[in-house]
Amino acid sequence: MNKSKLEYIWLDGYKPTANLRSKTKIMKDFDGKLDSCPMWAFDGSSTRQAEGGSSDCLLKPVCIHPDPVRRNGFLVMCEVLNPDGSPHESNGRATIDDDDDDFWFGFEQEYFLWNPETNLPLGFPKDQTPQGQF
């Protein structure tokens, strides 16, 4: 029995800038296919996507990728839906044409070389002079 970690990822309802949210579902014998990712509910009142009295929202998987960090892990990109299945007002993706393959996402990881003698980044001034205006 093989278990997989599916990290459901979506945009919350914060304005002016939405934040990434996620929660993990553990599934047995997952085949890695989008069609095998079930819809999942969450409490929208904690993400500014629903009022406290009726706070259920749905996560609809729309894209899946292997997790580059976790073994047997998958990143499941989701749209947010209302309980009736209609697109939530924070779901800007619902207005995008699904036939357009021009949209991509990626991860960026930054690295620093560290000088063990100064305990500062390599080439960084010892007096830690400000870098100046950008």
Give a label for each model feature:
Residues 1-134:
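Glycine-rich, acidic/polar active-site loops that bind/position phosphate-bearing ligands
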